């Protein structure tokens, strides 16, 4: 990953809410927004300690943060999350819907419980996060939803459930952008490829030609980096930097878009 100069505090005075911000991509997004001066609502579902560690790390950047527990698959919990965020900071400017789960399973083995678990978090929750964001954001705010490169990939076996759950989010994004435009709120989605997180550690072998369970991580990284012109796989900071741009006033003319974040990888 390229080094950078000290980051200007270009989001000073803004308040951002990031779901699933206690680890992985969500943590990377929260830290990049905080480096630029935004105050952060760090949402988590069950892992309080990692979320509080993110809050502590944000505090070291000079920005403010609070961790708020909420199960975003439950709409009353989504409502409470936004109300607590507003009570703490007074307003909201940026909402990033990051939480998600991935599953690989043969189509004939997918159960109703599998379907509900994946779509409740990856799809339904994102709809209601965006809905509440629209209601509570200040005019000129930013909504960023989470799709995946998988939504438009072909040739990945046993991935229909996950791919479908993310493809729906891309439809949400284009429609929400139209609905929110009169308030100058932009709505975009990002679609990352493989990013070095715990989800990557568990599932990335599926994307490697001839990949197998238990494959050494070094081989997985090498196999996926071979598809990327930049010669590496992504880390959460890469995704966070793009979200930080989408959160900035300079990004206003980027609206209703799904931004592929693969480093130019061809798979």
Swiss-Prot record:
Keyword NADP in annotation: yes
UniProt cross-references to CDD domains, sorted A to Z: THN_reductase-like_SDR_c (cd05362)
Keyword Cytoplasm listed: no
Active site: residue positions: 147-148, 162, 166
Record key words, sorted: NADP, Oxidoreductase
Pfam families: adh_short_C2
Record: residues binding NADP(+): 25, 45, 71, 98, 162, 166, 195, 197
Chain segments annotated as coiled-coil in the UniProt record: none
A single MF term (Gene Ontology): oxidoreductase activity
InterPro entries: NAD(P)-bd_dom_sf (IPR036291), Sc_DH/Rdtase_CS (IPR020904), SDR_fam (IPR002347)
EC number: 1.1.-.-
Family to which this protein belongs: Belongs to the short-chain dehydrogenases/reductases (SDR) family.
Record-given protein name: Hydroxynaphthalene reductase-like protein Arp2
Species per Swiss-Prot/TrEMBL record: Metarhizium brunneum (strain ARSEF 3297)
């Amino acid at each position: 990953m390229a080094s950078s100069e000290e980051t200007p505090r270009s989001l000073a005075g803004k308040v951002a809410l990031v779901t699933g911000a206690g680890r992985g991509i969500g943590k990377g997004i929260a830290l990049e927004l905080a480096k630029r001066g935004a105050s952060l609502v760090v949402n988590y579902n069950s892992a309080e300690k990692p979320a509080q560690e993110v809050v502590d790390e944000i505090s070291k950047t000079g920005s403010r943060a609070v961790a708020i527990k909420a199960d975003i698959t439950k709409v009353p919990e989504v409502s409470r999350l936004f109300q607590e965020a507003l009570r703490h900071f007074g307003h909201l400017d940026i909402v990033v819907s990051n939480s998600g789960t991935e599953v690989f399973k043969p189509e004939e083995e997918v159960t109703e419980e599998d379907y509900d678990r994946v779509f409740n978090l990856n799809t339904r929750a994102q709809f209601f996060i965006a809905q509440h964001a629209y209601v509570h954001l200040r005019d000129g705010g930013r909504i960023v939803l989470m799709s995946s490169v998988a939504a438009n990939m072909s040739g990945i076996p046993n991935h229909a459930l996950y791919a479908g759950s993310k493809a729906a989010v891309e439809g949400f994004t284009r429609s929400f952008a139209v609905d929110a435009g009169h308030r100058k709120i932009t709505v975009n989605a990002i679609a990352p490829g493989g990013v070095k997180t715990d989800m990557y550690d568990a599932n990335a072998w599926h994307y490697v030609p001839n990949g197998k369970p238990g494959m050494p991580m070094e081989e997985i990284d090498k196999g996926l980096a071979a598809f990327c012109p930049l010669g590496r796989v992504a880390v959460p900071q890469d995704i966070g930097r793009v979200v930080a741009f989408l959160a900035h006033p300079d990004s206003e003319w980027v609206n209703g878009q799904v931004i592929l974040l693969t480093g130019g990888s061809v798979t």
